[in-house]
Amino acid sequence: MFHVSFRYIFGIPPLILVLLPVASSDCDIEGKDGGVYQNVLMVSIDDLDRMIDFDSNCLNNEPNFLKKHSCDDNKEASFLYRAARKLKQFIKMNISEEFNHHLSTVSQGTLTLFNCTSKVKGRKPPSLGEAQLTKNLEENKSLKEQKRQGDLCFLKILLQKIKTCWNKILRGAKEY
């Protein structure tokens, strides 16, 4: 006997497709005119870009964070909110006082421009993690340096995505 699902016989779409919510943002943006972004955040993002040594290998590896969260239509605000929370984790790297200052400026400045629902705020971002300890101290130092380079690559890519997403929001605001 053939075992065929009832809904496929009559062309009824699977229930999951019917129940999917319409794509919408969980956050509202304040300051869409771009004044705070261009005068404060953009300056710090550009300074951070100059401080990070660019490695051409960075572009080949797309981090999981960016695979899960993107600056799609109607989700720009929630992407920027999550990205700003992710930036806070990089302050722990203690690269320099100036670097931490710019990271804090971009992170806090972005977070203050958004009013997000508890659905987004309730999530705790994953930690950057630590390299596992090994028996050989030199190997451990090498792993930590590779991890640091990987984190800086991720930070560089994340900053570029943040800048692109902000520009997308500002272009959309000027059209109205």
Curated annotation (Swiss-Prot):
Keywords: Cytokine, Disulfide bond, Glycoprotein, Growth factor, Secreted, Signal. Glycans are attached at residues 94, 115, 140. GO terms for molecular function: cytokine activity; growth factor activity; interleukin-7 receptor binding. It is found in: Secreted. One of its GO terms (cellular component) is extracellular space. Disulfide bonds join 27-165, 58-153, 71-116. GO terms for biological process: B cell proliferation; bone resorption; extrinsic apoptotic signaling pathway; homeostasis of number of cells within a tissue; immune response; interleukin-7-mediated signaling pathway; negative regulation of extrinsic apoptotic signaling pathway in absence of ligand; organ growth. Residues 1-25 form the signal peptide. Pfam families: IL7 (PF01415). InterPro entries: IL-7 (IPR001181), IL7_sf (IPR038325). Hematopoietic growth factor capable of stimulating the proliferation of lymphoid progenitors. It is important for proliferation during certain stages of B-cell maturation. Belongs to the IL-7/IL-9 family. This is Interleukin-7.
